[in-house]
Curated annotation (Swiss-Prot):
Name under which the protein is recorded: 1-deoxy-D-xylulose-5-phosphate synthase
Database matches in Gene3D superfamilies: 3.40.50.920, 3.40.50.970
Catalytic activity: D-glyceraldehyde 3-phosphate + pyruvate + H(+) = 1-deoxy-D-xylulose 5-phosphate + CO2
Family annotation (PANTHER family): 1-D-DEOXYXYLULOSE 5-PHOSPHATE SYNTHASE-RELATED (PTHR43322), 1-DEOXY-D-XYLULOSE-5-PHOSPHATE SYNTHASE, CHLOROPLASTIC (PTHR43322:SF5)
Keyword terms: Isoprene biosynthesis, Magnesium, Metal-binding, Thiamine biosynthesis, Thiamine pyrophosphate, Transferase
GO MF terms held by the record: 1-deoxy-D-xylulose-5-phosphate synthase activity; magnesium ion binding; thiamine pyrophosphate binding
Superkingdom, taxonomy of origin: Bacteria
Length: 631
């Protein structure tokens, strides 16, 4: 638990208590809450900049609205630490993102105040609209609020929801948390006044009455519209959101409770869809995070008095870094290469690429569907697109992957980071399904590198193909096998035998382990005790059919191993291939179970799934009890 004293915050166990506080006390509470968030995250790691930026907004929302009766729907959800603290989870913040602890995102099973589970972006308006209309159908009177960031607002899904919500007859409030701009002091007071004015009942009624009165007089009506637009234009950009049917209010200072609370109070009395634009600053109140919000977006544990400190020892190369180096090297070799990311420059390892090749770098925003089809369009004109995307986010562009890329057999490379389990971010970010959902697509190739060296080589192999290929690799570092300097690839669709069975005279079942990806190394460790053959398959599609037949015919049983969903995964591909060839062998499929695996230490989570060396040995011994397991 944080060691600093937070006397007022320690009296708040639910928002009903917060609603009893006077405005001056709320300001004290916000200051303590910000300090608590900083101290907590410094001890556990987690998302920091975004949470420091939403403290006052969170306090104001819970103060004005009768949560949990009124629904707050957070977009993405990594900015909800203050929300969690104020809704009864303060004493559990020391378990944040740890196995058995509270999630770093909203989860319906964790609290009644978490009205909608989330971690991917741009879902809040759709969910909130559904809740608002469902409440109306039941005759329930409640307010529904979607809180969405400016980055998430760039996604098509958000605009689809706005388009629907603008014509829906319900009381929905969309709060745009804009943390990519600032309010200058001279404008702030006027903003506050106009926001309260525009959110007032008199303004809304007068605006609607004026439209009714002036409708028979088009010239006067047009003049009135232009005057209103010019008046708003003093403090806001041209408001697209009113074209969707929303009453636009703001922008207002998202760190000023004297602006937020009366404005939200006024909005509660309005009918129909409302849109409140608040401006916040990432890292607010912690100078180091304010100066570098990207570095403090998701830090590991650190000392708040010192800030982030680079390790004195050189860390092992990560798969993300391997990709970033390969991308720059291949771009220098082939000017056709273009790099595309849906707002994941840092996470996907594209910072150096952007710096060295700015005219070939495309950040399309949080828009995975667009990213995939954008790449397809570039490929049509002779470019060689490489789409750097997390495995879990490619799910959002699946139709485009099939219809726009694979159906037209376009040479697009998908670099799938965070394949498999991801640790602290939990089930929402796990890349558990890519093998299953990619291998069923015609024309698609899928590579599974075992280590850093193979990652670079298989990226080159994928790039050399004239059809779409994905290369999946896990978060963090691998076995420590240094990549080779060149750009040579490995044979497409071909694996290798990494360990041959040694005891040929044994009567025990002859076992072969077929490893896909980085689990090759625990497979090799397990094989020493089992005297099993180990095959590094490298490709989930196409499978190395010739090698598979050779291994199957020389062994009594096969074990497939993958850090992905068992159902429909690489193991399924093996059994399908053997069945089609008429080769009858028992196949033990090891991988991720048919459950959503929550947050925790990655190594411990893999062990719980039986995907470490000990678990592999135990599973094989249990399935094939006649085998001689060396101890």
């Amino acid at each position: 638990m944080p060691s600093t004293s937070f006397p007022l915050l320690e009296t708040i166990d639910d928002p009903a208590q917060l609603r009893q506080l006077a405005r001056a006390q709320l300001k004290v509470l916000a200051a303590e809450l910000r300090g608590f968030v900083l101290e907590s995250v410094s001890r556990t790691g987690g998302h920091l900049s975004s949470n420091l930026g939403t403290v006052e907004l969170t306090v104001a929302l819970h103060h004005v609205f009768q949560t949990p009766h009124d629904r707050l729907v957070w977009d993405v959800g990594h900015q909800t630490y203050a929300h969690k603290i104020l809704t009864g989870r303060r004493e559990r913040m020391h378990t944040l993102r740890q196995q058995g602890g509270i999630s770093g995102f909203p989860q319906r099973g964790e609290s009644v105040y978490d009205t909608f589970g989330t971690a991917h972006s741009s879902t809040s308006i759709s969910a909130a609209l559904g809740m608002a209309l469902a409440a109306k159908r039941k005759g329930e009177s409640r307010h529904t609020v979607a809180i969405i960031g400016d980055g998430a607002m760039s996604a098509g899904m958000a605009f689809e929801a706005l388009n629907n919500a603008g014509v829906a007859d319900c009381n929905l409030l969309v709060v745009l948390n804009d943390n990519d701009m600032s309010i200058s002091p001279p404008v702030g007071a006027l903003n506050r006044y106009l926001a309260q004015l525009m959110s007032g009942r008199f303004y809304a009624a007068a605006k609607n009455m004026g439209k009714t009165v002036l409708r028979p007089m088009p010239p006067l009506l047009e003049f009135a519209k232009r005057f209103e637009q010019q008046a708003k234009g003093l403090v806001v950009p041209a408001t697209l959101f009113e074209k969707f049917g929303f009453n636009y209010i703001g922008p207002i200072d998202g760190h000023d409770l004297d602006s937020l609370i009366p404005t939200l109070d006024n909005i509660k009395g309005l009918q129909g869809p409302q849109f409140l634009h608040v401006v916040t600053k990432k890292g607010q109140g912690y100078k180091l995070a304010e100066a570098d919000p990207v570095a403090y977006h998701g830090p590991a544990r650190f000392d708040p008095a010192v800030g982030l400190v680079k390790s004195s020892t050189a860390p092992r190369l990560t798969f993300t870094q391997v990709f970033g180096q390969w991308l720059c090297d291949m771009a220098a070799h082939d000017e056709r290469l273009v790099g595309i990311t849906p707002a994941m420059r840092e996470g996907s390892g594209m910072v150096e690429f952007e710096q060295r090749f700015p005219d070939r770098y495309y950040d399309v925003g949080i828009a995975e569907q667009h990213a995939v089809t954008f790449a397809a369009g570039m490929a049509c004109e002779g470019a060689k697109p490489v789409v750097a995307i997390y495995s879990t986010f490619l799910q959002r562009g699946y139709d485009q992957l099939i219809h726009d890329v694979a159906l037209q057999n376009l040479p697009v490379v998908f670099a799938l980071d965070r394949a498999g389990l991801v640790g602290a971010d939990g089930a929402t970010h796990a890349g558990a399904y890519d093998i299953a959902f990619l291998r069923c697509i015609p024309n698609m190739g899928l590579a599974c590198p075992a280590d850093e060296r193979e990652c670079r080589q298989l990226l080159s192999s994928a790039y050399a193909q004239n059809h779409p290929v994905a290369v999946r690799y896990p978060r963090g570092s691998g076995a420590g096998v240094a990549p080779l300097a060149g750009l040579d690839g490995l044979p497409f669709g071909k694996g290798e035998i990494r360990r041959e069975r040694q005891r040929q005279d044994s009567n025990a079942p002859r076992i072969a382990i077929l490893a896909f990806g980085s689990l090759l190394y625990p497979a090799l460790e397990a094989a020493d005790a089992l005297d099993a053959t180990v095959v590094n398959m490298r490709w989930a599609k196409p499978l190395d059919d010739a090698l598979l037949r050779q291994v199957a015919e020389g062994h009594d049983a096969l074990v497939t191993l993958e850090e992905g969903a068992i159902m429909g995964g690489a193991g399924s591909a093996v059994t399908e291939t053997l069945n089609a060839a008429g080769i009858l062998r028992p196949v033990l499929q090891l991988g991720l179970a048919d459950i959503f695996i929550e947050h925790g230490d990655p190594a411990k989570l893999l062990a719980m799934q039986g995907l470490n060396a000990a678990g592999i040995r135990a599973a094989i011994a249990a399935r094939f009890p006649a085998i001689d397991v060396a101890r």
